[in-house]
Every structure is written in structure tokens, then in C-alpha cells.
Amino acid sequence: MNELIKHKLELLPDSPGCYLHKDKAGTIIYVGKAKNLRNRVRSYFRGSHDTKTELLVSEIADFEFIVTGSNTEALLLEINLIQENMPKYNIKLKDDKSYPFIKITNEPFPRLLITRQIKKNDGLYFGPYPDAYTATEVKKLLDRIFPFKKCKNPVNKVCFYYHLGQCQAHTICHTDKAYWDSLVADVKQFLNGKDDKIIDDLRSKMLEASNKQEFERAAEYRDLISGIATMRTKQRVMSKDLQDRDIFGYFVDKGWMCVQVFFVRQGKLIQRDVNMFPYYNEAEEDFLTYVGQFYSDQRHLIPKEIFIPETIDETLVAAIVPARIVKPQRGEKKQLVALATKNARVSLQQKFDLLEKDLRKTSGAIEHLGQLLGIEKPVRIEAFDNSNIQGTSPVAAMVVFVDGKPSKKDYRKFKIKTVIGPDDYASMREVIYRRYSRVKHEGLQVPDLIIVDGGQGQVKAARDVIEHQLGLSIPVAGLQKNDKHQTHELLFGNPLAVVELPRNSEEFFLLHRIQDEVHRFAITFHRQVRSKNAFSSKLDHIAGLGPKRKQLLLKRFKSMTALEQASLEEIQQLGIPKTVAEALFDHLTSKSEV
């Protein structure tokens, strides 16, 4: 804890409000709320914490706080601050999960559409549906029953659907608003589960067609009735009152929270949402934050009613969500919340079981790898790869795996400084020397195993530096690829030999992951350096444009193509003198005109 934090802790009030933890760069990394700011914020810097909270605290270099008039105000402010700042330690809803809805547009001639985007005052939305297939099947059925406009053609033109009897836009006068209002009302009734009237109408039409011996039309009506019945049976009835509601349940264990939401529409369970995340405060408080964020996301329509667990304060939920908030006390409704809670518990337990299984497999792979090589269990592995094109922009990269998992904070990049031309062995010698001379002289953690991407030449070069130049004793292995650039074999020992390793073993999969990761990291770095060098070299002859200004341009425009499209004003906004900016702009303009 630094002196700034110590001083600020003394100034905290005994009031409700929000606090914002910041890292050394001033970036907000966590937003929280508290009934008592003094007690809550101080708790981070006192006593022991679990691993995830210790990680958060280790990054806190400063904090701010905002006093509010009540706990409810603090909750609302917290949700807004999280949305605005997106702190890395706060709950993040899955951004890849958007459900399909059926939409009736509010155009003069309404259309039925499937969409994943909800826009206010843009029509009526029904759903969500569990997947695109289900939504499409429902829409197909609606298209056959209700003659909405199906295309964007002008209404004075007859379309294909008109001939199928599935579109009446051409025949109904656009001034007949009552017709379209009635049609929309029928669809709303149908999608809200009140489809008895529709079925009765279809049965009447089927009998009428049959009496007229129009058997094809009668069969069409029969199939529509059958389609409605099928749609009914595919949805599980969870509530007899046919109400639209979302049902929340949550469970906490080992510093993690799982929230399950059942989407119930017209008494039928149509989908569920599952989210798991670490929590840092009281479970009830983080659950409230989750609910606020959940409904702030436009992908989630607010139903008429929301069921919550009995441990949650319904007045706080009502303050952030404009719906009827219910804490069921008995019967079927209480069982629904219990079911959501049970599912949350099962999901969280499955997560822990999978993590434990993965940990056992990885730990076993590391231990077995050590046995195969005749060394101690290689808990920390450092792997190296070189990257260049015909010796240009040569770089190298190091990745670190601890307990079989990447430790990205320990990754390192190297620009090759002493090697001229494409010499992979010399490049490896330079990088190994630079890395482990620092390890030796600065007392950094020594790895249990070094892996180099390459064959005998790379391994011998690395081992020679480690043993003879630095006098260290660290095992060095090599990973060779085949002609398809895939992990092929492991080299180790003195003399070097291929280590027999089954392709379907966990040890092989671990080595494959390590080799892929170091290759990815090296290639990415090489592309960045090459792009930067190419960008810089094209601007070398412009007077007044030195390395710092080139760096400014690269940071702002990212590529030469983007810079060539920039205006003179955009270039000058970076603080580049007018004469230099004009010279650069003239150069770029003349180049683009060639």
C-alpha cells in the first residue's frame, strides 16, 4: 500500500457511494458500491484475501470515491460507471450471445422480420427464441397464416407472395389502417399463446374447402393447424398462468458466482442464459449489479414480471428495472426460482470439476514429461522462437508456461541486434544470452526447462550459451516441425536424440500448445516490426520528420494506406509543425496521384 492510498483511506466517509480502483497508469480497473465507503474500501487493504482479490489489490495504485444519498443511488451509479469505463475486474456479460426475435415493423404496410438487434420505437418484438432455426420456423408458420407484406417492392406492384396468397399489400388500400391494425393484433394474440381463435378460423376454412372439394387448399389448412400444434408441444410449460417473466437464480462457491436466467414467455420456457464470473463483494450486491447490467443490454427485453431469490432486496431491483419484482414464497413459483438456483449450482460445480480434471491432466503431463527427460518436474517452461524474412527485421520471442498454462505477464520480445542476415543459430545464441544473463545477474526466477523452436543446431547453440558462456545448469530441449509446419518430435539429451512421445499423449498436446504459442507470439511481433520499419522508411527523406514524429504518425494512423488518406488538418493535430505537415501532405498527395 503506497502513501497516497494510506492518506486517502483516512478521508473516507461513513456514507453510501461508489469507489473506483485505478492502476498505476490511472486506468479504472474496478468499480464497486458500498453502504459504508469507509469500511468497504479499507477492507481491500486489510487482512487476507483469496487469490483473485489479491490480484486485484496488487494492481491498485489509487482510488476515487463518489458519495451518494442512498444505497439505491449507489447501485444505479455503479451500473452507469461500469458501462462507461468497462473495468477489467468487473462483471462482463457475454458479448457473443444475442438471441433472435421476431419483429413486426411499424411501417404503413407492416412486415414480419427476424432480428437480433432491438431498437426503441421501431416496431413490436417477440421472443427471444433459443436459436435462429426456431425463430425461422415460427416465422415461416406466421407467413403462411398472416398475409403481411413480404418484400420491399412498391405496393402498386404484384409480388410472388401475392400469387401464393401470402401477401395482401397490393390488394388492400394503404388507407385501410384498420385492416393492418387488426392483422397485427391477431399476430400479437397468436405469439402470446392465444391461438385458439386462429385454429378455429383455420378449421372452418379447411371444412369449407373440403365441402367444395378443394382438397389441396383443405390440406394446406390442415398442415397449418398441425404446425401450430407442433410449435405448442416443443415448448415446456413452466407456469399455468401464461405470464411473461424472467426467473433468476444464483449460486456462489470458491469466490465465483453463477447466475441463471430462465426466459419464460406465455408460461413456456423458451431459453436460458448462464453467466459465471468471480465476485469481490457480498454476493447479494454483485447479483444486483449483474441484474442492472443484464437489463441495460438492449438484447434483453424487460418482461412484465421478474422472479428473484428471497435473499435479494426487491426494492433495489425495482429501482433499476421497470418491471414487477416478485420474491415467490410458496408453491409452483417458488419452485421455479429453486430450479434456476439448482441449475446455477450444477453449472458452477461442473466448471470446478472440469477445471480440476484439466489441472490433474496438465499436472500429470508436466510430471510425465519430466520423467521422460530425466529431470525434475518442469513447472516453469520458457520457450523461444525466431522470426525473419530473408534476414530482414529479425526478431525473437519468449513465452512462459507455468503449471502447463501460459503466463502472459512473463512473455518477452527481442529485436535481434548483433546478427546480420538470416542466421538462425546466431540469433538464438544472442537471445538466449540476453535473457539468461539478466536471469543470472538480477536474480530472476530460473526456469525448469528451456524449449527452443528448431532442431539440433538451435538446441546446441542455446545449450552452449547456457553452459559455457553463463555457467548455468538449465535443461534445453528442441521442438522440430514436419514439412507441414506441425509439431513433429522432441529433441533432448547429450548427445541429442528424439524422445519417444505418443502423439495422443497429454505431454505431446502440451508441447504442441507451447510451440504454437511461441510461434504465434514471434510472428505477430515480427509483423509489427516489419510494418513499422516499412512505414518509417517511406518517410525518411522528409525534412523535420524524425523518429518521434514517425512514431506519432504510426500510432495514430496505423498504416501507410490510412496516412495517405489523411487530411492536412489531421496531420497537424498531432502537433507536427505546419511546414513539416505540408511537406508530408504534398509527398503523400503526389504519391497517391501517380
Curated annotation (Swiss-Prot):
Domain called UVR: residue spans: 196-231
Cellular component, GO annotation: cytoplasm; excinuclease repair complex
Domain GIY-YIG per the UniProt entry, residue ranges: 14-91
Pfam families documented for this protein: GIY-YIG, UVR, UvrC_RNaseH, UvrC_RNaseH_dom
Keywords, alphabetical: Cytoplasm, DNA damage, DNA excision, DNA repair, Excision nuclease, SOS response
Principal location class: cytoplasm
Keyword Cell membrane on entry: no
Subcellular location: Cytoplasm
MF-aspect GO terms: DNA binding; excinuclease ABC activity
GO biological process, one term: nucleotide-excision repair
Annotated InterPro entries: GIY-YIG_endonuc, GIY-YIG_endonuc_sf, GIY-YIG_UvrC_Cho, RuvA_2-like, UVR_dom, UVR_dom_sf, UvrABC_protein_C, UvrC
PANTHER family: UVRABC SYSTEM PROTEIN C, UVRC/OXIDOREDUCTASE
Membership in a protein family: Belongs to the UvrC family.
Role description: The UvrABC repair system catalyzes the recognition and processing of DNA lesions. UvrC both incises the 5' and 3' sides of the lesion. The N-terminal half is responsible for the 3' incision and the C-terminal half is responsible for the 5' incision.
Subunit record text: Interacts with UvrB in an incision complex.
Matches recorded under HAMAP family: UvrC
Protein name as annotated: UvrABC system protein C
